Amino acid sequence: MATTKSFLILIVMILATTSSTFASLEEMVTVLSIDGGGIKGIIPGTILEFLGGQLQKMDNNADARLADYFDVIGGTSTGGLLTAMITTPNENNRPFAAANEIVPFYFEHGPHIFNSSTGQFFGPKYDGKYLMQVLQEKLGETRVHQALTEVAISSFDIKTNKPVIFTKSNLAKSPELDAKMYDICYSTAAAPIYFPPHYFITHTSNGDIYEFNLVDGGVATVGDPALLSLSVATRLAQEDPAFSSIKSLDYKQMLLLSLGTGTNSEFDKTYTAQEAAKWGPLRWMLAIRQMTNAASSYMADYYISTVFQARHSQNNYLRVQENALTGTTTEMDDASEANMELLVQVGETLLKKPVSKDSPETYEEALKRFAKLLSDRKKLRANKASY
């Protein structure tokens, strides 16, 4: 009798634990963050193509899209463009781009975006006209509030000297942020030196004109928007009733996938103190951006990793980054077919690499694990909604 009673207690405990696990998964806040990096957006594009394919396979649904699985998708510069591509609705209210359409977009339009050189020494390298043209063509008149999931796209206003973050959740307090997506995408991609800043207007709740004078979102987030995306997700968890059970800063209930565009971490192999001592202002301007982006990316990853580990949630955070780019693949604007093919190879090779020196798990395996969580969570939410 005692044995039977103990067995029943054990069964109840298992069922309670299982129920808690399902509830926890159902209420998990899922976040996708995509770095800036110009044409190097092909690297995260390749990673997203793999992830999107896994989700379609797991759910047996060719129409499955990334926006169906993530509560927050954030990006800066080229990552902001990718964010818009996978969250902006088409005429059928589905994302206008599937994951496997991202890389072809770069191959089709990259050579034109990075070919319209102004020919001016004092001025941006490219005029940005083709970039704006293709953004208007693809995104139409769509505004932030129409995004199919929460977005977080950063830019920087050079007139107010403040970062500007475009999110759906900010619109109630700041309706002037409900800008057209093509204006936002151009702004977040308007990297100093490469493209002209972007000026446009919206209107406040009182009907007053609101001006924007924006440049690349990397100025605000220094290339890695993961912390920004995570902060938006944290606010979402606090304000959305669907996540009412999540406690503040409960990273066990956060799932963060952060995609980099690659960097060269071996600066000592590229620059030496003796070499840099001879540089003038222009040479430093070109080098400092690369150094700053790399350093900020490492620091953001270090901070997020530390926080997730401290909360015993390290498996809920995955940073996918290639830290050993060489040659032309380090350039933000080399849109030659040969270099774009190399960037695809970088992404494909990265999938086969281990996530860390301490773990045999590859990025491919880790992404499959994330895809399973995303798929299961979506099914749990769908089942709950059907009751």
UniProtKB/Swiss-Prot annotation:
Its EC number is 3.1.1.-. GO terms for cellular component: vacuole. A motif (GXGXXG) lies at residues 36-41. Residues 32-230 form the PNPLA domain. Keywords: Coiled coil, Glycoprotein, Hydrolase, Lipid degradation, Lipid metabolism, Plant defense, Signal, Storage protein, Vacuole. The active site is at residues 77, 216. Residues 1-23 form the signal peptide. Gene3D superfamilies: Cytosolic phospholipase A2 catalytic domain. It is found in: Vacuole. A motif (GXSXG) lies at residues 75-79. Residues 322-385 form a coiled coil. It is an enzyme of class 3 (hydrolase). It comes from the Eukaryota. Its main location: other. Tuber. GO terms for molecular function: monoacylglycerol lipase activity; nutrient reservoir activity; phospholipase activity. GO terms for biological process: defense response; lipid catabolic process. Belongs to the patatin family. The nitrogen atoms of the two glycine residues in the GGXR motif define the oxyanion hole, and stabilize the oxyanion that forms during the nucleophilic attack by the catalytic serine during substrate cleavage. Patatin have a dual role as a somatic storage protein and as an enzyme involved in host resistance. Probable lipolytic acyl hydrolase (LAH), an activity which is thought to be involved in the response of tubers to pathogens. This is Patatin-12. It comes from Solanum tuberosum (Potato).
